């Protein structure tokens, strides 16, 4: 019985520390700050809804976790793209959080089957 209590306490402690560490590791994003930093992104991704090339992803309304993960993977080299890899190298953790918050805050444009925005 005592061993079971020790196991539960140890598990609770490990989980608490893991959640605390992840909260400290990921800064909170600020959409207003991200908007100020998004000028370079707009060169390819446009305003988030209208990209300069249809092969570039639209960023507006994407989940911030997805955007953050993608930028981290470009920065680490896990995702391969020469342009994004180079851009991501210049980003701090706070930049990534801010940009993720900004693009997630934008309303995505939905198109009907004929391609017209609704």
Segments predicted by a language model, with ranges:
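Flexible coil segments in periplasmic/lumen-exposed cytochrome c-class electron-transfer proteins
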Residues: 26-38, 47, 79-118
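Sequence context surrounding c-type heme c attachment/ligation sites in exported
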Residues: 31-42, 51, 60-69
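Bacterial N-terminal signal peptides that target proteins for export
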Residues: 2-12
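Amphipathic, hydrophobic secondary-structure cores in small proteins
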Residues: 57-62, 68-70, 75-86
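His/Cys-centered metal/cofactor-coordination and adjacent catalytic loops
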Residues: 27, 54, 59
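N-terminal signal peptide c-region/cleavage motif recognized by signal peptidases
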Residues: 20-23
């Amino acid at each position: 019985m005592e061993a079971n209590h020790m196991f539960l306490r140890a598990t609770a402690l490990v989980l608490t520390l893991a959640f605390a560490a992840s909260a400290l590791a990921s800064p909170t994003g600020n959409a207003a700050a991200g908007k100020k930093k998004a000028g370079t992104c707009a060169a390819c991704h446009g305003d988030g809804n209208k990209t300069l090339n249809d092969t570039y992803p639209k960023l507006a309304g994407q989940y911030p976790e997805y955007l953050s993960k993608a930028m981290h993977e470009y920065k680490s080299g896990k995702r391969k793209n020469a342009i994004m890899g180079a851009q991501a190298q210049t980003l701090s953790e706070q930049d990534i959080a801010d940009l993720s918050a900004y693009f997630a805050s934008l309303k995505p444009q939905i198109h009907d089957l004929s391609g017209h925005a609704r």
